[in-house]
């Protein structure tokens, strides 16, 4: 039984298999939702084909099931949501809240990486152009349920950022806002590497006139070199054997109550214990080394 007032989600991109850092985000969002008897959805963010690995999406779903993280309802695939994104782009254009930009990346790099609004009043057409938001509601700070008030970089918050790429692909910030609104997500629990784009997403909620969700940004898992575990730096995929010791490591990473007798529990019993004892206030805010690396070095 669920209380539908809370809807959370886990939204991986199929650029590779899930690793320990991915599990932290998935488990944290799952526990936050289940502890409130809420709904937990899964969305596959497959809108960037050049970065996708064939078969990765199916593997990700199998990994979630193997670790006992069963979602509610159907999986939402961003590759099937293009019409919704086109409608959102059309609405912004009709309201005068976006414009075409033909500035090359090299020009923006010369500006220090922050776009200066050069094309805002030039009335370009769509040929060989990106679409940028005409920033009306810059968000300078937001509340994170774990970290408190987070201040944004003023230049980044005020930038007219891209919502449709020159190569025809929909930008992440547009797609994620349209889909979170569509799915009724009330709180987004994800990794701290996504703190920076949050203010852009919040500004889009304001542009559309939609109610924004709450946010929780979990600590990042690092490798031995202090870099974030990611598919790009070849983080090892989650183990395919007994998921329980890995889940216990993830719970410890998240600062949760130690599960002393986990060897005597099934995966389902272990997760029920974790839900019953979940405390967001116990989650650390600083990044840390994956316990598997720490244990290996002892």
Curated annotation (Swiss-Prot):
L-glutamate binds at residues 9-13, 45, 172, 190. Its cofactor is Zn(2+). Zn(2+) binds at residues 101, 103, 115, 119. GO terms for molecular function: ATP binding; glutamate-tRNA ligase activity; zinc ion binding. The keyword Ligase applies. Transmembrane segments: none annotated. Its EC number is 6.1.1.-. One of its GO terms (biological process) is tRNA modification. Keywords: Aminoacyl-tRNA synthetase, ATP-binding, Ligase, Metal-binding, Nucleotide-binding, Zinc. ATP binds at residue 231. Binds 1 zinc ion per subunit. One of its GO terms (cellular component) is cytosol. SUPFAM superfamilies: Nucleotidylyl transferase. A motif ('HIGH' region) lies at residues 12-22. InterPro entries: Glu-Q_tRNA(Asp)_Synthase, Glu/Gln-tRNA-synth, Glu/Gln-tRNA-synth_Ib_cat-dom, GluQ/Sye, Rossmann-like_a/b/a_fold. The keyword Zinc applies. A motif ('KMSKS' region) lies at residues 228-232. Belongs to the class-I aminoacyl-tRNA synthetase family. GluQ subfamily. HAMAP family: Glu_Q_tRNA_synth (MF_01428). Catalyzes the tRNA-independent activation of glutamate in presence of ATP and the subsequent transfer of glutamate onto a tRNA(Asp). Glutamate is transferred on the 2-amino-5-(4,5-dihydroxy-2-cyclopenten-1-yl) moiety of the queuosine in the wobble position of the QUC anticodon. NCBIfam families: PRK05710.1-1, PRK05710.1-3, queuosine_YadB. This is Glutamyl-Q tRNA(Asp) synthetase. It comes from Salmonella typhimurium (strain LT2 / SGSC1412 / ATCC 700720). The gene is gluQ.
């Amino acid at each position: 039984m669920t209380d539908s007032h809370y809807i959370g989600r886990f939204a991986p991109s199929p650029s590779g298999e899930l690793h320990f850092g991915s599990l932290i985000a998935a488990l944290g969002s799952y526990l936050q939702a289940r502890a409130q008897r809420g709904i937990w959805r899964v969305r596959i963010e497959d809108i960037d084909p050049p970065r996708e690995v064939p078969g990765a999406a199916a593997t990700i779903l199998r990994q979630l099931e193997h670790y006992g993280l069963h979602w509610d309802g159907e999986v939402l695939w961003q590759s099937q949501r293009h019409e919704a994104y086109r409608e959102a782009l059309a609405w912004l254009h009709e309201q005068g809240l976006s414009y075409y930009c033909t500035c090359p990346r090299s020009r923006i790099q010369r500006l220090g990486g922050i776009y200066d609004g050069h094309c805002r009043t030039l009335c370009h057409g769509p040929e060989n152009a990106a679409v940028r938001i005409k920033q009306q509601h810059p968000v300078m700070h937001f509340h994170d349920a774990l970290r408190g008030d987070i201040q944004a970089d003023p230049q980044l918050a005020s930038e007219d950022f891209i919502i449709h790429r020159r190569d025809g692909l929909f930008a992440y910030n547009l797609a994620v806002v349209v889909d979170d609104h569509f799915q009724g997500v009330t709180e987004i629990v994800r990794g701290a590497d996504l703190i920076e784009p949050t203010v852009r997403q919040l500004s889009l909620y304001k542009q559309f006139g939609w109610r924004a969700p709450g946010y929780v940004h979990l600590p990042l898992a690092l490798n031995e070199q202090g870099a974030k575990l990611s598919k790009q730096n070849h983080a090892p995929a989650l183990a395919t054997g007994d998921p329980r010791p890995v889940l216990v490591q993830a719970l410890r990473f998240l600062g949760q109550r130690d599960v002393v007798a986990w060897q005597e529990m099934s995966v389902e019993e272990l997760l029920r214990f974790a839900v019953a004892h979940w405390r967001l206030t116990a989650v650390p805010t600083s990044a840390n080394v994956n316990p598997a690396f720490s244990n290996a070095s002892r």
